Amino acid sequence: MVALGSINGWQPAEGPVTTWMASPAAREAARNGRRSDLTPSYQRIRHLRAAYQSESLGMELPRLMIVAWEMPGICDIRAMTATINAHVRRNDAYHDWFHFEDGAPDVVVRRMIDNPELIDFVPTDFGIMDTEEIRTHALTTTPETLQWDCFTFGIVQHAESFTFYASVDHLHIDGMSAGLIFFDIHLMYSHLAQSGAEAAVAGQVASYRSYAARQHEQVASLTLSSPEVQDWIEFARDTQGDWPTFPLPVDDVEVNNRGTFLTVDLLDDAGTELFETVCDAAGARFSGGVLACAAMAEHEFTGTATYHGFTAYDTRTPDIDAMTVGWFANLVPITVPICTATFAEAARAAQQSFDDAKQLAGVPVERALELAGPQLSGIKPPSARAMMVSFMDFRKIPAAELFEQSGFGTYADNLSHGGVNLWINRQNDKTTATISFPDNATARKSVHRYLAALIQAFAYAVKSTTGWVETVADHANSAKTLEGVSK
């Protein structure tokens, strides 16, 4: 199973740790980088402003993604050094440093390292560490968002294998990028270690800077009458600016911004196959069924006639950005009439909404609200507390068996922005749900209630398309513990 969760779920065995960090010369090259007029992508702008605000308030920002897996043998430090530098030099998402003009949060300045050969990551031996020390090390040695080198790499050596990890600020990567890092590092290192070649020969990948330029060019062409803008305006009106959030209390995170994850099994292998069959029969795909179940679960707590939600969509352009590391994922709106719907009706509506919303992925909601002007006065863009429901079919990842064999996982730092996010993942032999939330008693109780409703929604999707309401409500409001919950 591909792992997804909190850093506490990462269990590297004890061993000597080597970490690759930017050399002093590379950091100097970033500080002296040429100022660029290219505006960062909207995804980056949101994250940079959140980092600036958190820093000004003296708070920590949830930001780090730890990508880790196992590799056989004794790590060849020379080969790994060449691999890491080749990876960083060929992905220009790593080549930019951002700061704010005279401390003003409205003006983001990009400084560029024009010559990738100036980037040099060098290994440092940190000695033997146990599991907890390794996790702390991976988090604390990676610089903050507003520093250029907010990405580090490392290995933990064992008797017959080693653990590789990348600790990267979300500024530079999204969920898909985690898999790209795996393929880049794993395959390049294996080639160098086995061939004895001195340098990695890495093919060219598309520029993330080019993506940002295309994004802003597209946004500049939008007008109030653009269909995508009108769709965002309609969604904002329908929600009255009360953007989708978790339907139950989670407490305030201003005092305690610790975060955690839970993972539960939704369906076993047979149940997963049956769920797909039910979705097909309803005229939907698996993704539509997933969103329908999320709508049904939320309905138990809100009672609203229509579900409004956000889901993630990858904006990479096929054959252009498919292998590019960067933050491409964006949120799109989902609308599902749910009050009197059967599962089949809800699944069809969710699928249609998802398919229609894909065109909105390239249109930042911030720009739509700007164009709407007085029509939506007083409505602000979604905050970090907006809830996302994401679906991933891990079976469709190229060479998915390699992920399984290597124990691949993606882990987040143990911080929270106060919101709740949900990932529903189809594994080789089951379907799981992973949910992130503030680490406090109120949020934990609410998450247990929500997951109970979600589990029952999936169960009744495969067993019956009617009569789910009473049973889901009964389970959602019970004090029963959840089976199969893992941290």
Residue spans for each PLM region:
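Gly/Ser/Thr-rich phosphate-binding loops and adjoining beta-strand/alpha-helix segments
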Residues: 24-40, 59-79, 145-166, 251-316, ...
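A short N-terminal helical cap/helix-turn-helix that marks the beginning
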Residues: 97-98, 189-206, 233-244, 446-487
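Short, low-complexity Ser/Thr-rich regulatory SLiMs
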Residues: 98-102, 155-159, 424-428
